Amino acid sequence: MKIRNSLKSLLGRHRDNRLVRRKGRIYIINKTQKRYKARQG
């Protein structure tokens, strides 16, 4: 999982990326390509 300050650029890297809020953190998850997983930090 990548930890990035800004997720906006990562969101457009794959069409299946989803922006999700969990426990006050913002995540990008991707069911088809797991390598695009990221967290804002």
From Swiss-Prot:
Hydrolase among keywords: no
Pfam families: Ribosomal_L36
Keyword Ribosomal protein: yes
Disulfide bonds: none
Record keywords, A-Z: Ribonucleoprotein, Ribosomal protein
Membership in a protein family: Belongs to the bacterial ribosomal protein bL36 family.
Protein name, entry field: Large ribosomal subunit protein bL36
Organism: Azorhizobium caulinodans (strain ATCC 43989 / DSM 5975 / JCM 20966 / LMG 6465 / NBRC 14845 / NCIMB 13405 / ORS 571)
